[in-house]
Amino acid sequence: MALWRPGDGKVYLPPTPVSKVISTDRYVQRTNLFYYGGSSRLLTVGHPYCSLQLDGLQGKKNTIPKVSGYQYRVFRVQLPDPNKFALPDGTLYNPDTERMVWACRGIEVGRGQPLGVGTSGHPLYNRLDDTENTTLLVAESSDSRDNVSVDYKQTQLLIVGCKPPIGEHWTKGTACANPAPRPTDCPPLEFTNTTIQDGDMVETGYGAIDFAALQENKSEVPLDICTTICKYPDYLQMAAEPYGDCMFFCLRREQMFARHFFNRQGVMGEALPDSYYLKGANDKAAPGSYIYSPTPSGSMVSSDSQLFNKPYWLQRAQGHNNGICWFNELFVTVVDTTRSTNLTICTATSPPVSEYKATSFREYLRHTEEFDLQFIFQLCKIHLTPEIMAYLHNMNKALLDDWNFGVVPPPSTSLEDTYRFLQSRAITCQKGAAAPPPKEDRYAKLSFWTVDLRDKFSTDLDQFPLGRKFLLQAGPRSVSVSRKRAAPSSTPTSSPATKRKKRKQ
């Protein structure tokens, strides 16, 4: 006898359909027009450790900025609006249904100045013992800080995208109220994502943390980072970004080794468990400081391992955005610690000086940097169908407004009042139409190095170094010259002699 029984397996329903992120190659049509854009020589000079204010003087003109070889340089490259270009072909696109955008195809970041190693340090560095050389243990005292200098981790970095890069670091978190923490307890740590701005310090080998919030003695690290935040690029976050705007591609090279090994002086906040050691006599009854910390070193710099002063061509980006510069902007993030030489400058207190005396001279410190940015851009167009416009609006609502695509209000059918004398005391105050609000800069509260290329585009690629390299890799520029002798131009008047055929007998 056959009986029906319900199935024991679970019923799986299909997932709810969601909108997919598509590549820009699906809706961006590339043209055969290429443009070169390049900056002038970009220079910056300042103090490598801190920003200084001249005595008794105020204002930016009397401020010496902080310029270090261990800072991020984030260039905000402003491009011209291609929809306002005088194009050589007027039929290239339809302004009613299409919009033009730029695609980055090539970039070269030029770096001037010689290779060099820059050092940093602290005149009151928290070091107790040289834990590598055990014979050099110092006597316990209330203050064993010493003047120590280091050369940081060596880093070369290049990130290109149409949005600023995302950084990560650890900072002081919020502890739970129950139980209430004591003021001397180790604070909880919180992982934080922030935008990397121009002038932020790179991770130098001491960790990506907020030193101002987590190191209150200001002696754990060198001077240039003891009151600031060291950020590390969040490659995982930028690689997982849905639209791929923060990082079209990146190049990085890091190297470091530990030069010295110290331990920290202070009261151990967390005592070692007794099971970890056997107590001794006299000064060995209790262990000393076990907070060990090395000093980093970036080792040798060489021109054989340089990421800069060479071109890079973008054929396929790692994300869905294949080099399209939304809002006509491009962000280039550069770190190069292989040119971090600090210049020492000396002036005499009362010239002329005939005999050396240390108090007769004043010592100063400066750091200089030199950059040159070159780009190859390709002109592209987007056919704005309803589906594409809905997708772009979902990606960024301000993009269509930037292209002057807005909602047109319906015409008013009500009867409006219009006075003859608008400036009259006999009638109520007439308020004019409200002025449209100015466009807000999305990055007004952030600091970047602005590079304006809106009037520096050219189609003559062969007149610029990067343009010639682009033409060379795109194909040969001229036909090879033949070494064969040319045939005579004139034709003989007489006909050539013909061979007489032999007849068979």
From Swiss-Prot:
The organism sits in which domain of life? Viruses
One GO cellular component term of this record is: host cell nucleus
Q: Where in the cell is it found?
A: Virion; Host nucleus
Q: Which UniProt keywords apply?
A: Capsid protein, Disulfide bond, Host nucleus, Host-virus interaction, Late protein, T=7 icosahedral capsid protein, Viral attachment to host cell, Viral penetration into host cytoplasm, Virion, Virus endocytosis by host, Virus entry into host cell
* Main location group: virion
**GO terms for biological process?**
endocytosis involved in viral entry into host cell; virion attachment to host cell
Segments carrying the region annotation (Disordered) are 476-505
Pfam families (UniProt xref): Late_protein_L1 (PF00500)
Report biased composition (Low complexity) as residue ranges: 487-497
As one GO molecular function, the record gives: structural molecule activity
Q: How does it assemble?
A: Self-assembles into homopentamers. The capsid has an icosahedral symmetry and consists of 72 capsomers, with each capsomer being a pentamer of L1. Interacts with the minor capsid protein L2; this interaction is necessary for viral genome encapsidation. Interacts with protein E2; this interaction enhances E2-dependent replication and transcription activation.
Q: Which family does it belong to?
A: Belongs to the papillomaviridae L1 protein family.
User: Which function does this protein serve?
Assistant: Forms an icosahedral capsid with a T=7 symmetry and a 50 nm diameter. The capsid is composed of 72 pentamers linked to each other by disulfide bonds and associated with L2 proteins. Binds to heparan sulfate proteoglycans on cell surface of basal layer keratinocytes to provide initial virion attachment. This binding mediates a conformational change in the virus capsid that facilitates efficient infection. The virion enters the host cell via endocytosis. During virus trafficking, L1 protein dissociates from the viral DNA and the genomic DNA is released to the host nucleus.
Q: Report what the protein is called.
A: Major capsid protein L1
Q: Which gene encodes it?
A: L1
